[in-house]
Amino acid sequence: MSLKVGSDILLAMLISRAFIELMLYRACLTLSYQILAVTAGWHIYELTKDPLSLGLLGLAEVVPYFCSALFAGHAVDQLSKKRIAVFGCSLHVLIATLMLPVALGYLDGLQGGVRWLIYAAIGLAGLARAFIRPTYQVLFAQVLRREDFAQGSAIGAVIFQGAQVVGPVVGGLLIAWPGLVSAYIASGLFALLAIIAVALLRYTVEPIKPSELSMWAGIVQGLRFVFSKQIMLAAMALDMFAVLFGGAVAMLPAFIDEILQGSPENLGLLRAAPAIGSVLAGAWLARHPIQRHGGRYLLGAVAGFGFAVIGFGWSTSFGLAAWFLFFTGVFDAISVVV
């Protein structure tokens, strides 16, 4: 009986226009970002042949993200969610546009300055992500009923991770054959499709009324809420540090070049491996949501994620590296759903 009820809920979500539009928005924007990430990483490593440049690329993204995340959350509470979503997508279109003259070689005369342009572009991507993530979460809560959240979250995870599988592969193939220019164009086009999808979005639930608190009061209230909930704080901190110290994919261009002597196609496939694991785990969790012992699953997922990253670090072959990255995706999907 419960299986039939679960199937009915799943079918209702899949035929909901608003839910489909939201998933299209998420898929297209994720494809845009993944193609950009693969392309920018390969681009800057080709220019510098220095693993440090990849670390700086990640830093260029994370600093704007963390600096604007709290303000972005307040903006999402106060402003139109659709407009903020369009703003985030528009930044991705702007990034792709800015990177075209760099990829075409028009700015080669700047020499070392070219990489700083790439860092600046990725910084804009970090700023966009700060607004995109909370906006999606609020739109998700408005499109679905509370009782549908568990399965809706699992479906959203499958869509997200599916785009994370396709995006890097497409990016790697575009870099290998047509070249960097085509990859940046593809990233911009997917961002445009995301703008169209979210512009068409119609809520099926009455929108949440904006808070009357000031920006700083809202930020302080949010921080107090998180720090007052020890279980929430511990879970968030555990997941954050696991991801912070386990971001193996950031170094993949150097790993491909120095250890595997591979090509952009190999980069795309390895970057897609965690997402493949997440898709399979998410598909399972969509039909079998975790209802009890969430803390145990979270601890096990974080521990498994750490061991998989260590295994990847010791890998000397493409197959072994892909296998360990696959399991990082499996454990990451569990932690996200929990």
Region annotations inferred by a language model:
Residues Y106, V138, Q142, L180, ...:
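Helix-loop junctions on the cytosolic side of multi-pass membrane transporters
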Residues G41-L47, L100-G109, V166-A186, E258-L260:
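Transmembrane alpha-helix termini and helix-breaking/packing motifs in multi-pass membrane transporters
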Residues I20-V38, A60-V76, S80-I95, L117-A176, ...:
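Substrate-agnostic recognition of the 12-TM MFS/MFS-like secondary transporter fold
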Residues Y45, L98-V102, Y106, A125, ...:
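MFS-fold secondary transporters
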Residues G6-P64, R224-P274:
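Helix-loop boundary and gating motifs at the non-cytosolic
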Residues P101-A121, G313-F324:
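Helix-loop junctions at membrane interfaces in 12-TM secondary transporters
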Residues G112-W116, I175-A191, S263-L269:
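A membrane-interface helix-boundary motif in multi-pass transporters
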Residues C67-F71, Q78, I84, G88, ...:
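C-terminal transmembrane bundle of multi-pass solute transporters/carriers
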